[in-house]
Amino acid sequence: MERKEVIVSEQELARQKEFTRKMREMNDRRTRTPLALVDTFGCQQNVADGEVLMGMLREMGYELTRDENQADVILLNTCAIREHAEKRVYGHLGRLSHTKAAKPDQIICLCGCMAQQKVVADKVKNSYHHVDLVLGPQAEWRLPELLHEVYTKNKRVFSIENEHGRIAEDLPIVREGGVRAWVSIMYGCNNFCSYCIVPYVRGRERSREPEKIIEECRGLIAEGYKEITLLGQNVNSYGKDLGTDYDFADLLAAINAIPGDYWLRFMSSQPKDATNKLFDTMARCEHVAKQLHLPVQSGCDRVLKAMNRPYTRAKYEEMIAYARSVMPGMVLTSDVIIGFPGETEDEAMQTVDLVEKTQFDALFTFIFSPRPGTPAAKMDDPVSREEKQVWFEKLVDAQNAISAKKHAAYIGRTVKVLVDGESDDEAFPLAARTEGNRLVRMKGDKALIGTFAKAKITDSNTWALYGEVVEE
């Protein structure tokens, strides 16, 4: 696609502003301020999308609420990565039929990745008659127009156009907390891993202009945000569609040059596009957290090929060795799928072997979940769920032992942390994160929330560190 076809035009955005104005006028005529609720499921990209949805709703005159019974508009911002997430959404939709029965003028909207799938839209159309609006992630910038259509035409609206996707800039955003910020740098995916639904629901890769991203980050740092996470389905592909040599490492360096007291992170990364240039840039940039999330998915070359992951185990290990050589002490995390169709026990154990040899700090582990419409969903899968569960538990046990050992090594150390909220542990009331994104529950004054602090680590377990604030 030409760049001009990727960017939503000023005229189109102006049209949405006009519908925003009309919605605000309608809401201003109400006897009370209308309430809206956005419930987000899934990944950080969905969280960022949810912040835009909340921003648009607020500009339309809605106040935000968490009370489904009081909300005039409810948006379920959904995830399609795993079957479990979809089941949760359908269960939630079923419960909302009762809130709508008690409040008939309530508008219920399904958006996010689930909504982009025709099979889901058809199911909602035929079985969830209380849902008024369905719009996929590529149409979310048109929320004011579509919501106006629901209200004024008194009909159900479905917008799941199967387009490659575009970029709508300068949309309003509501960020909560004021400490951590998510910044989308690109959208879509071109990789088509055989198990993944994302390219089908998010469209093709399209990068935001670097100037727009840098400007947004500069504003966040000026507002006092202490951590910025750059988001994309594959940030390592950033810039390939810009028509220049400018790449993700260049963007990272440019943001790092902004003065301030902050950490810079990014996710997600595809190993096939990870470069030594990126690792070198991470190493020399003071604000970039020395933490790398690089999903390997499998330790078996045959399975990687079946997954359409174009790298080998040896290549992955080579990348990690280089990254660790230029960033000693780097925190490394990854994703792994166990039980891919056709995978044997020996192949699954190759993944366990990779985990034990690589010594990840943490691992996000999943049993294969078939996604309708993907090649993997059609593959022969003779292994039972029960047998896959046995393999999965061996993987989890191996990683838990590694995580516990790595966390124990922090005991007695004093580390810089970002205090970002309250803990659910009364004995350690503060929740913080290290530069490597390790959770720290600690003792200290709640006035520290939103600031960097020094924490002395006194204890640990598999999942967290424990400590206390110390004076610098």
Name each model-derived stretch.
Residues 43, 239-260, 307-310, 370-401:
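Radical SAM enzyme [4Fe-4S]-AdoMet core and its adjacent flexible, acidic
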Residues 176-179, 189-191, 288, 298, ...:
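Short flexible coil/turn linkers enriched for glycine and charged/polar residues
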Residues 105-110, 117-119, 222-345, 356:
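Conserved SAM/AdoMet-binding glycine-rich loop
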Residues 6, 378-472:
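Terminal RNA-binding accessory module
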Residues 1-238, 277, 292, 314-325, ...:
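Proteins enriched for Cys/Gly/acidic motifs involved in redox and nucleic-acid/cofactor modification
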Residues 141, 191, 236, 301-302, ...:
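Glycine-centered loop/turn positions within well-structured domains
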Residues 193, 213, 230, 266, ...:
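Conserved, mostly hydrophobic/aromatic
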